[in-house]
Amino acid sequence: MPLREFKIVVLGSGGVGKSALTVQFVQGIFVEKYDPTIEDSYRKQVEVDGQQCMLEILDTAGTEQFTAMRDLYMKNGQGFVLVYSIIAMSTFNDLPDLREQILRVKDCDDVPMVLVGNKCDLAEQRVISTEQGDELARKFGGCAFLEASAKNKINVEQIFYDLIRQINRKNPGPTNKKEKKSGGCILL
């Protein structure tokens, strides 16, 4: 079976741990130091449900920065990881507008996405409950929701694997090479 490519975009406010989640998933290391991202792209080959997948993961700047570039990320992305920090309410409140922007740019109501409450290892500093995350996911049309910790490797792989499964359900890949090459035009 051929390798299928997936374009995933990680979005959220500055400091929520987008890079930490991405680097933990791709390289298996936790980045302790906060170094604001402009844009980083990572590739990782994984197997999900028996399918070989090449993920191209775009780790973006915080939503408050580089807004002009964001429409382009959204246009090209097939699936989105929307990240907030469970210890910062403002990062949670930013997500509905971000989701609306994705739906507007994609011109679609059904876009594969996972809502992620990051930094669940800091439970004693929590200001956003798991129930609030669940409720927001329901408001987002029942999108997937996970709490994660890049530091402790909690739910990191599940975020990306769930997104791959959503993309596959929405847009199954070709079942054979002939089908992939088929196409054509109709002359009228």
From Swiss-Prot:
It catalyses: GTP + H2O = GDP + phosphate + H(+). The modification Cysteine methyl ester is found at C185. GTP binds at residues 12-19, 59-63, 118-121. A motif (Effector region) lies at residues 34-42. Its EC number is 3.6.5.2. It is a lipid-anchor. It is an enzyme of class 3 (hydrolase). Keywords: Cell membrane, GTP-binding, Hydrolase, Lipoprotein, Membrane, Methylation, Nucleotide-binding, Prenylation. GO terms for biological process: Rap protein signal transduction. SMART domains: RAB, RAN, RAS, RHO. GO terms for molecular function: G protein activity; GTP binding. A lipid is attached at C185 (S-geranylgeranyl cysteine). It is found in: Cell membrane. InterPro entries: P-loop_NTPase, Rap1, Small_GTP-bd, Small_GTPase, Small_GTPase_Ras-type. Pfam families: Ras (PF00071). Residues 186-188 form a propeptide. One of its GO terms (cellular component) is plasma membrane. NCBIfam families: small_GTP (TIGR00231). Belongs to the small GTPase superfamily. Ras family. This is Ras-related protein Rap-1. It comes from Physarum polycephalum.
